[in-house]
Amino acid sequence: MKIFITGVAGFLGSHLADKFLSLGYKVGGNDNFLGGYRDNVNPKVMLYDFDCRDRHLMASILHGYDIVVHCAATAHEGLSVFSPSFITRNIYEASVSTMSAAITANVGRFVFCSSMARYGNQEAPFTEEMQTAPVDPYGIAKVAAEQTLKSLCDVHGMQWNIAVPHNIVGPRQRYDDPYRNVLSIMANRNLRKLPSYIYGDGNQLRCFSYIDDCISCIEKLALDSNIQSEIVNIGPDENPITINEAAKLVAKACKFKHTPIHTTDRPKEVKYATCSSDKARTLLGYETKTDVKTAIEKTVAYIKEKGPKEFDYSFGLEISDNAPETWKERLL
């Protein structure tokens, strides 16, 4: 069996590739390297350097593959209200292009990696039965891609599952991106002896997921023939913590005196965003094996090994009005 992973140089995609390879599957994948690191990619992966929006090339490459796991995304929810064209183009257009190519190439199953942004500002914990209610262009694009996938699969017979991973942390995560990955941003600053920035009062509530705890669930969504047409939250629902608490854990792991700088709230940021894991436990056997303290320590160890970096602002802002000062003034 052959499995193709989009965004295979990214955080999630590269770990999935390792998992499938360890199980004896042939793995191919592509990346445009906007967000991934080339050295994340296992040398056994058949790697293609191109953008998912190149539908014709994607279709030609996908011939012979049985499963596509679509991880590729500009996963920048907060940035999406300031660079909506860039973000939605690389979420919706890239996703639909890949779906179309997969159908053309007679791929049997498509696993779409969505986002908890699909739930918006509803009462937490979010369950899969909730209506989608995204509050920003990123979430809107993810939900539109989900709906398109279901529509296309209904017409053309391709199997589908949708994974909803949330707040994943661990080694290989992009840590020089100023717009996403809050714990890695804090660690990258603290390791350079710079204080963390916290948006608003810091009481935003999150459940952080360690990468290794999530991989087996996505593996089952890809490989288990008895699991079809399912949407599943992936990650823990126990022991949510505030951003203030997370910042203290990061500082401790970095051996840095914790003196955060509080700045204004980010527009459209959901205050209390946690997901129920009940369905993942029942259907996929999800289990939280790594607590948040250990997850942070492993993330910090990875950044230490790679070396902290200056932040990369190359994406820029399409709209600067009301954007966080940390982004406009490149303060990170």
Tell me the role of every PLM-derived stretch:
Residues 144, 148, 152, 182, ...:
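Hydrophobic alpha-helix immediately C-terminal to the catalytic Tyr-X-X-X-Lys motif of short-chain
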Residues 53, 82, 90-93, 136, ...:
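Residue-level signal for the nucleotide or nucleotide-sugar donor/cofactor binding architecture
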Residues 201, 229-233, 241-247, 255-272, ...:
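C-terminal "lid/loop" region of Rossmann-like NAD(P)-dependent oxidoreductases
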Residues 16, 218-222, 247-250, 296-303:
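Hydrophobic "lid"/C-terminal helical patch
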Residues 143, 156, 168-184, 194, ...:
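Glycine/proline-rich active-site loop of Rossmann-fold NAD(P)-dependent oxidoreductases
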Residues 1-165, 306, 322-323, 327:
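N-terminal Rossmann-like NAD(P)+-binding domain of SDR-like oxidoreductases, especially those catalyzing
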Residues 279-314:
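A contiguous, mid-protein "functional segment" used to position or interact
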Residues 68, 214, 218, 234, ...:
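Non-catalytic, hydrophobic alpha-helical segments
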